[in-house]
A protein has these predicted regions:
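Bacterial N-terminal signal peptides that target proteins for export
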Residues: 1-9
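Short, linear, compositionally biased motifs with a strong N-terminal bias
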Residues: 11-14
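C-terminal motif of bacterial Sec signal peptides marking the signal peptidase cleavage site
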Residues: 17-21
């Protein structure tokens, strides 16, 4: 055998070994192409999932491609119950109608709380009259009957300016919208419609920053890095276990005193997708690292016991939801995980 031919044969053999080794990394499919994990949903949960996805893809060295979209919690669930994505990011629990659609389409799901958020009521930094508001005052502003009627600051408190309120809030497909309206107005989606709405929280940040008479609500993770551009309003709730107005902060959320605007955040994983090795690895990686990564993007990790319970739910492939198809205000996340899930 000629030396050149021997060298070529050896080179081909080495390439075959290397190709086999690369193809054997978790996640790649039988053709050797990178596996794809499709995620969509909440803009609130997006920063956490994006951070986890980046770390996971780095670890997998190109063997897995994770796509993370933002279409709002409702938009993400629409895709999820049609079987179009593997994971749905959600800033509120799955609703009754979404549960019904999933069942009709044969979609089973694993519900996993992954972090806490504090919905933050914000005003412009030039606003020198508002430091706190009661839940009753917020309801007066945001309930459906307020549309076209409660339009000026002095209608909330007589001593406040007779200036028109510029309202900014979440769009109707947002889980933030569902939770805020449930917590403040008493019913999901019960809201006035004459305000600037967006599923993109950065749009709301810019709107409040640009108007001295603005009032809005956004997730804490979008407030924290922009706290010089807007001011958080302390919230007073007559049902709270402490008296007085409470500002949103990691300490107050973990202490259980920032109510009713503290909430758990979720990912929903398709049971069918869990049969894909890449998805199973990603979900395990998510629960292992989310506590650290959530803090990096200004969210609040759950207690360690909650993550352990979530891991048990994954390992046993326990499907269904711990909720009754509606958001529940002020509920400890451990209680959610202890409930028998239902489809």
């Amino acid at each position: 055998m000629a030396p050149a031919f021997k060298l070529a044969v050896a080179f081909i053999a080495i390439c075959a070994v290397l190709s086999s080794a690369c193809g054997g990394r978790g996640g790649t499919n039988s053709s050797g192409e990178a596996a794809v994990i499709k995620i969509d949903g909440s803009s609130t949960v997006f920063p956490i999932t994006e951070a986890v996805a980046e770390e996971f893809q780095t670890e997998k060295r190109g063997a897995v491609n994770v796509t993370v979209g933002i279409s709002g919690t409702g938009g993400g669930f629409k895709k999820f119950v049609r079987g179009e994505i593997d994971v749905a990011d959600a800033s509120r629990p799955i609703l009754t109608e979404e549960m019904a659609q999933a069942k009709a389409n044969g979609i089973e799901y694993i519900e996993l709380p992954i972090a806490f958020d504090a919905l933050t009521v914000v005003v412009n930094p030039q606003n020198d009259w508002v430091t706190s508001m009661t839940v009753a005052e917020l309801k007066k502003v945001w309930e459906p009957d307020a549309q076209g009627k409660i339009t000026h600051w002095n209608q909330i408190r007589p001593e406040w300016p007779k200036e028109k309120i510029a309202l900014f809030g979440a769009g109707a497909d947002s889980g933030t919208f569902d939770y805020f309206t449930e917590a403040i107005c008493g019913k999901p989606k019960a809201s006035r419609g004459d305000y600037t709405a967006s599923e993109d929280d950065n749009v709301l940040v810019q709107g409040v920053e640009g108007n001295k008479f603005a009032l809005g609500y956004i997730p804490y993770a979008y407030f924290a890095p922009h706290s010089a551009r807007m001011k958080a309003v302390a919230i007073e709730w007559e049902k709270n276990k402490v008296q007085g107005a409470i500002l949103p902060s990691p300490e107050n959320v973990l202490a259980g005193t920032y109510n009713p605007l503290s909430r758990p955040l979720f990912i929903y994983v398709s049971r069918k997708s869990m049969d894909k090795p890449a998805v199973k690895e990603f979900v395990d990686f998510y629960l292992k690292h989310v506590a650290t990564l959530a803090k990096e993007v200004k969210y609040l990790p759950l207690p360690e016991t909650a993550y352990q319970m979530a891991m048990t739910r994954v390992s046993s492939l326990q499907t269904g939801t711990g909720f009754g198809g509606v958001p529940e205000v002020g509920l400890p996340v451990e209680e959610i995980l202890k409930r028998p899930p239902k489809a």
